[in-house]
Amino acid sequence: MKEKTGWESFVDKTIGDMFSGTGIVSYNFRNHQAKVISNDAELYSSIITHAFTRSLYTDVCKKIIEELQKDVEDNKHCDTVGFITTHYSPHNTNERKFFTVENAKRIDYMRDRLEAIKHTHTHTLTDDEYKFILASILLSADAVSNVPAVYGCFLKHFKAKAVKNLLLQPIHNNTTAVVDGSTTYNYDVLNKEFLSSFETDLVYLDPPYNARQYSKNYFPLNMIAKSPETLLSELPLKGKTGIPTDCFMSSFCKKGGVAETAFETLFKELNTKWIFLSYNSESIVSKERMLDIMKRYGDTSVIERDYKRFKSYEYNKDVEIKEYLFCLEIANR
């Protein structure tokens, strides 16, 4: 990116990360002293990214995380039967195995306790600290999940990592102050009111590549991210896996020109000078078509790299595909 833009560093730059996902890209920009505007339509992702881009590992965070972990080590969670235990573990007659009953109870207990702390310590627990702790719960829960790669299904038998007891660990140990103005959002990126609300020097886009909807593949993490008191509104859940009825459906996962139109909207509405887009040769929009669309808005180039498709199931064969990094320098900005 520095080579393309001619920048020596990201200091004093405002960077947009519009499909923040794991939050790692935003976190790296934070560590390079950039102001970061992050967004993801998935609630769990926006919380994790907030923790990576805005939150510090404070003494308050450390104290609460250690207290929650000690509570479960002292078995204070054993009588907790919350939403995750009831619907996403083999508790009683439920057959879903996203988590063991033990770990589901730990998750439910920690979520209940965190909400109680939030409501009783409103003057001492900041929003940044709350989201730091919640993000830590999310990643610690993910570390003991019983799924092949994503949460679209669970495994019939619990794998080795899933039977380990959940250990609550901080999402990071960064105590360096963030650049003023760094913000994380939880919007559909095509929301034009949202797109008009900020201005950046560069935007990085890592959208869905195929027809698999993220909400349908990560919904248990979204359920953990939501306040326990709101979860009853998610019932009834659908199907063998317990998918909620309100899953967000991204236009970037849809064929028939829908994804192309979505990209057009971003290239037109984003108030930025540079756009970098990650995509690959198996994506919905072809390389040639993407270049045609981008060229309407400015100078365009693409870098290609060979790599093997991620193998989430043993019976999948490794397939050589090309990863693309498109670069668009928008004209007249």
Regions found by a protein language model. Name each.
Residues M1-M18, I24-H32, S46-I48, S55:
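S-adenosyl-L-methionine
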Residues G6-E8, K192-E199:
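Short amphipathic alpha-helix with an adjacent loop that forms part of the alpha/beta core around
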Residues I15-F29, S38-L43, S196-N217, S278:
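Conserved proline-anchored active-site loop of SAM-dependent methyltransferases
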Residues K35, E42, S46-N174, S215-G257, ...:
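Class I S-adenosyl-L-methionine-dependent methyltransferase module
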Residues N186-K192:
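Conserved SAM/SAH-binding loop
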Residues F248-Y297, S301-R305:
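Conserved Class I SAM-dependent methyltransferase catalytic core
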Residues K287-R333:
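Class I S-adenosyl-L-methionine
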